[in-house]
Design a protein with these regions (language model features):
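Phosphate-group recognition and catalysis centered on beta-loop-alpha active-site segments
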Residues: 21-314
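Bacterial N-terminal signal peptides that target proteins for export
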Residues: 1-11
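Bacterial N-terminal signal peptides
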Residues: 9-19
Length: 314
């Protein structure tokens, strides 16, 4: 059976198993990874507007906190890769040379201008995408983005979901902030805290997901993201263990699904051209877990895959 017959293909983001479909669904569910980030600078409201206009079913929000505890939509705990913070606040870097969002108030972050992602050398990380340079784009708060998406839903007659990741919860805890509680506070304020069919919450840290389920008692579906142990995530999780039957038994006790790296599922092609897959998906489904692999990108195809269409068709 082809992979697309086991899951719903999600363009540039994740896959959902058939069990996650509504009875009326008959086409792939699209989750926009950082918005339409291949066309417009990631996580800006412009990227989210374009994703909405392109028909995304879910739009992703990576969330970090400001120094005054406000959830903002930003992929990194640092600001310099996607904003002009170094030019506006040159004296605010820590000893490691990085500019941390947690060291700035929301008022200060509102003065920044967002741009296409850059590398350590200051050059575009993805040449050929949106050009670098000054512009009007800014860093939105989570509350602002929810209002923005809700407004577009109303004007366009749609119902778009949120796919929220808690970034670096242990870092935030060491800085004296409870990112899980602050994000849930925003969802309560905006009336999204009970929308089980419209919100997913994801995190690489199992303790944070257990806290969300057991202490904060959120009814929203939780996704345990699975990294590679070599990546150095700020968590005590053994991601190799999570890919075993025993590890998935543990995940099933607090989460509704897993978000594995695509290469933890796709193992390459055999000599006859057939696709080799790991047992991870089957093991997860045996335990009633949804599977949301990341990330399907036309500009970063796995070895042996010649086109994005082929990637979706494995």
């Amino acid at each position: 059976m082809r992979l697309w017959q086991q899951y719903l293909a999600l363009i540039a983001a994740v896959l959902l198993p058939w069990a996650a479909m509504t009875a009326a669904a008959s086409s792939p569910i699209v989750i926009a990874h950082r918005g339409a980030s291949g066309y417009v600078p990631e996580h800006t409201l412009a990227a989210k507007a374009m994703a909405h206009a392109m028909g995304a079913d879910y739009i992703e929000q990576d969330v970090v906190l400001t120094g005054d505890g406000i959830p903002i939509v930003l992929h990194d705990i640092h600001l310099e890769s996607t904003t002009d913070v170094a030019a506006r606040f040159p004296d605010r870097a820590r000893r490691d040379g990085r500019f941390y969002a947690i060291d700035f108030t929301l008022a200060e972050i509102r003065t920044l201008r967002a741009h296409e992602r850059t590398g350590a050398d200051g050059n575009a990380a993805f040449p050929g995408r949106f050009p670098l340079g000054p512009g009007p784009l800014t860093v939105p708060t989570l509350a602002e983005e929810i209002d923005f998406i809700s407004g577009m839903d109303r004007s366009r007659g749609r119902r778009t979901g949120l796919y929220i990741e808690f970034k670096a919860p242990n870092f935030h805890r060491r800085e004296g902030h409870d990112i899980a509680r602050r994000v849930l506070d925003v969802l309560v304020e905006k009336g999204y805290d009970q929308r089980r069919n419209q919100v997913f919450l994801q995190c690489f840290d199992d303790a944070t997901l257990r806290y969300l389920r057991d202490t904060l008692q959120t009814p929203l579906p939780l996704i345990q993201l699975i990294a590679d142990n070599s990546w150095g995530e700020d968590s005590d999780v053994d991601y190799d263990f999570l890919q075993t039957a025993a590890g998935l038994d543990a995940v099933a006790s607090y989460a509704d699904g897993i978000g594995p790296w695509l290469m933890q599922i796709y193992r390459g092609k055999q000599a006859d051209g057939s696709v080799e897959l790991s047992s991870l998906v089957a093991l997860a489904h045996e335990r009633g877990l949804q599977v949301h692999p990341y990330t399907f990108r036309a500009d970063q195809l796995p070895a042996g895959i010649d086109s994005f269409a082929e990637l979706l068709d494995i």
